[in-house]
């Protein structure tokens, strides 16, 4: 399902912070990758609707975990199960 370690770290960060909204630069800092890497690893998650994406003023890219998507809810359930181990 996930294409790289960076993408796994992105999903884990989003699962840990499900209620928050992030910009691309902030995610890049947290994940210690370039903003272009964030864009690349986020694209399949946006296409699968796990991640919501909007472009705001002057091109700022905003991301949020899509808690309404069934696949995203399944990820939350799985994450909560393995976190409890």
Describe each PLM feature range:
Residues 42-43:
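Short, hydrophobic-biased segments on the C-terminal half of alpha helices
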Residues 49:
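Glycine-centered, phosphate/nucleic-acid-interacting loop/turn motifs that mediate DNA/RNA or nucleotide
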Residues 15-19:
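Short helix-capping/hinge SLiMs at alpha-helix to coil transitions
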Residues 26-28:
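A short acidic, leucine-rich amphipathic alpha-helix
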Residues 35-36:
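Key DNA-contact positions within bacterial/archaeal DNA-binding proteins
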Residues 1-7, 23, 52-78:
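Short, cationic-aromatic polyanion-contact patches
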């Amino acid at each position: 399902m996930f294409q790289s370690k960076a993408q796994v770290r992105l999903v884990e960060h989003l699962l840990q912070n499900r209620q928050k909204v992030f910009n691309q630069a902030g995610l890049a800092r947290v994940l210690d990758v370039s903003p272009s890497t964030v864009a690349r690893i986020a694209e399949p998650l946006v296409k699968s609707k796990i991640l919501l994406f909007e472009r705001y003023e002057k091109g700022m890219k905003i991301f949020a975990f899509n808690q309404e998507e069934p696949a995203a809810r399944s990820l939350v359930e799985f994450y909560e199960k393995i976190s409890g181990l």
